[in-house]
Swiss-Prot record:
SUPFAM superfamilies: Ribosomal protein L1. It comes from Azoarcus sp. (strain BH72). Binds directly to 23S rRNA. The L1 stalk is quite mobile in the ribosome, and is involved in E site tRNA release. One of its GO terms (cellular component) is cytosolic large ribosomal subunit. Part of the 50S ribosomal subunit. The lineage of its organism: Bacteria, Pseudomonadati, Pseudomonadota, Betaproteobacteria, Rhodocyclales. This is Large ribosomal subunit protein uL1. The gene is rplA. GO terms for molecular function: rRNA binding; structural constituent of ribosome; tRNA binding. It comes from the Bacteria. Gene3D superfamilies: 3.30.190.20, 3.40.50.790. Transmembrane segments: none annotated. InterPro entries: Ribosom_uL1_bac-type, Ribosomal_uL1, Ribosomal_uL1-like, Ribosomal_uL1/biogenesis, Ribosomal_uL1_3-a/b-sand, Ribosomal_uL1_CS.
Length: 231
């Protein structure tokens, strides 16, 4: 069994694993535990009361975090004509159509998020085996297949995060950095939880927000009261 470092032991000692914390206190504690030499990400994990093995209970979508994510996102847009110009004007880093598809096929993928107009999907669809495994395939459910490329690009640049339940009904997202203030992190967490609540499937039964926990990249997880997380 691998030894647990003194640093990790000290971090774990600060967190009462049997306690469910109010959100502001939990976020302050997570920030206190973020002692790495880099600006750690602050993440949330939410266990939802859904059977994600059933297609009608998969929770998927996107939300713009009001305080941003602290990360610079490079955005690619597959579009032509006026839509291509609109994407460039909105701040897209890479814009193209067949030429961009050829770049991707050649192994040049210098972007973090991909947006496409509906007519471009005939080209993008051929890139599924390349973009899919990287989580870059545009999808209308998260707003990345759209005619409104201006809004899509601006949202991506402003701090939009995408989410989807895994097979166990768990959703993960980054809601900021350790350098963020507690208030900014709380605003982002509230926005994320509200988005999950709005996306609740009609087929979901019983308690929906079963467990909410926040953590930093290298820190311990801290459970949060679901009611205060969405207050």
């Amino acid at each position: 069994m691998a030894k647990i470092s003194k640093r990790v032991q000290a971090l774990r000692a600060k967190v009462d694993r049997n306690r469910i914390y109010p959100v502001a206190e939990a976020l302050a504690l997570v920030k206190e535990c973020a002692t790495a030499k880099f600006d750690e990400s602050i993440d949330v994990a939410v266990n939802l009361g859904v059977d994600a093995r059933k297609s009608d209970q998969v929770v998927r979508g996107s939300v713009v975090l009001p305080a941003g994510t602290g990360k610079t996102v490079r955005v690619a847009v597959f579009a032509q004509g006026d839509k291509a110009e609109a994407a460039r004007a909105a701040g897209a880093d890479v814009v193209g159509f067949d030429d961009l598809a050829e770049q991707v096929k050649g192994g040049t993928i210098d972007f973090d998020l991909c947006i496409a107009t509906p007519d471009a999907m005939r080209v993008v669809g051929q890139l599924g085996q390349i973009l899919g495994p990287r989580g870059l395939m545009p999808n209308p459910k998260v707003g990345t297949v759209t005619m409104d490329v201006t809004t899509a690009v601006k949202n991506a640049k402003a701090g939009q995060v995408q989410y989807r339940t895994d097979k166990g009904g768990l959703v993960h997202a980054t809601i900021g950095r350790a350098s963020f203030g507690v208030e900014a992190l709380q605003q982002n967490l509230n926005a994320f939880i509200e988005a999950l609540v709005k996306a609740r499937p009609a087929a979901a039964k019983g308690v929906y927000l079963r467990r909410v926990a926040v953590s930093s990249t290298m820190g311990a997880g801290v459970r949060v009261e679901p009611t205060t997380a969405s207050a």
